[in-house]
Amino acid sequence: MKKRMILGAMLLLSGCVQVDNYQAVVKHPAPAGLAGYWQSTGPQSSLVSPEAIASLIVTPQGDTLDCRQWQRVIAVPGKLMLDGGTFYNVTQKLDVYRLNQQGNTLEFDGLTLSRTDKPTVECQQALEKAGLDSKR
């Protein structure tokens, strides 16, 4: 038990965020400027191919959908977490990504996304399948 407390304190002090239980994460509503549809534009080194597309959908309630597509669609639901004034996207797979927004640009997981009016058709289908409210 002591080891866990020490490890937790070390992680907190080092600036790393770790999540061991998705259900225990408190979902935080999205600030007005963060809610909406975000999508990569052009090739990015963090994606598997120059043709790959990355999208992040953020609902006003704080639900997220990390949607990556190339030869198939991989969509992982998640939620926004606020820690020390910084927003993170925590996925159901326990991946934790810091969100850095500058106007209509959002950086996370080594990707640069731009605000868009609507998601791709494939990500919209994944959003509906996940049962998330996409109203922004």
Each language-model region and where it sits:
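A composition-driven surface/loop motif
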Residues: 30, 63-69, 123, 129
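Bacterial signal peptide processing site
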Residues: 17-19
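N-terminal glycine/threonine-rich, aromatic-flanked beta-hairpin/loop signature
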Residues: 24, 40-87
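C-terminal motif of bacterial Sec signal peptides marking the signal peptidase cleavage site
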Residues: 12-15
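Sec-dependent signal peptide recognition
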Residues: 2-8
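An anionic, turn-rich surface loop/hairpin at beta-sheet edges
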Residues: 82-99
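N-terminal helix-cap/turn-to-beta initiation motif at the start of protein domains
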Residues: 22-39, 131
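C-terminal partner/receptor-binding element of secreted or periplasmic proteins
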Residues: 108-136
